[in-house]
């Protein structure tokens, strides 16, 4: 929460310039956006090799020290997800170590904010819980908003419009201590909404008694929100 507050206060301080591009989730520095073709080209430039098995298309390569398959998902011809799946399966003990290592890496990366604590303990019986209770083992993180790319003027306007439902222009121009606190709280709320558009999460997948990790880099701006209904 302290990190989020710092980010939002920095956002308030830097609300002075136009955005050059949309701030979306990135994978290896590549925005999760655009067309499948452009995304493939960018991934190939990172060393990934296109593969096709039947009708299933993906790219193969190395990511974070593991051999992986990368899948591109779209909505209305716009990329909204990069899915990264381990190429090799491991046993229960090894997957717990891998899961916890990933949690630690994300927790110690200043570019991410966790929603909760996700570390598995020695007592966690993954096989039993997944088989009997259909439990999901997932960890959710969010990429910190890039204020050089964020639409700062748009954010300022959003904060202002929300506050105008409670206060007058004059009160916002010369805010009291109470209104100043309300301005910060509103900015934190809107900053959190911005952050939630950039989720990166992973889960344990079980297949035939073996396990692997699937990671998801999602661009919530491009996901389906029922507009085609």
Task: Give residue spans per PLM region.
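Sec-dependent N-terminal signal peptides
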Residues: 4-19
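Hydrophobic residues embedded in beta-strands of well-ordered beta-sheets
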Residues: 57, 79-80, 211-212
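A compact, surface-exposed functional segment
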Residues: 42-64
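A short alpha-helix capping/helix-coil boundary motif
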Residues: 18-20, 81-82
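Mid-chain, structured segments of secreted extracytoplasmic proteins
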Residues: 60-105
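Non-cytosolic coordination micro-motifs
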Residues: 20-50, 88-229
């Amino acid at each position: 929460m302290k990190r989020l507050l710092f980010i939002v206060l920095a956002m308030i301080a830097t609300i002075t310039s136009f955005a050059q591009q949309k701030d979306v989730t990135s994978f290896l520095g590549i925005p999760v956006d655009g067309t499948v073709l452009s995304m493939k080209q960018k991934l190939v430039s990172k060393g990934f090799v296109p593969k096709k098995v039947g009708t299933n298309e993906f790219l193969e390569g190395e990511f974070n020290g593991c051999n992986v398959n990368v899948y591109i998902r779209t909505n209305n011809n716009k990329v909204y997800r990069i899915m990264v799946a381990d190429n090799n399966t491991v046993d229960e003990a090894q997957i717990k170590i891998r899961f916890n290592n990933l949690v630690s890496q994300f927790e110690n990366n200043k570019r991410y904010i966790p929603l909760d604590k996700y570390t598995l303990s020695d007592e966690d019986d993954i096989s039993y819980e997944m088989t009997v209770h259909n439990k999901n083992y997932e960890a959710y993180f969010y990429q910190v908003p890039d204020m050089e790319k964020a639409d700062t003027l748009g954010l300022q306007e959003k904060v202002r419009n929300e506050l105008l439902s409670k206060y007058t222009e004059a009160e916002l121009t010369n805010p009291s201590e109470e209104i100043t606190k309300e301005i910060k709280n509103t900015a934190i709320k809107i900053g959190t909404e911005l952050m939630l558009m950039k989720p990166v999460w992973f889960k344990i997948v079980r297949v035939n008694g073996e396990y692997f990790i699937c990671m998801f880099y999602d661009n919530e701006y491009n996901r389906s929100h029922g507009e085609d209904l």
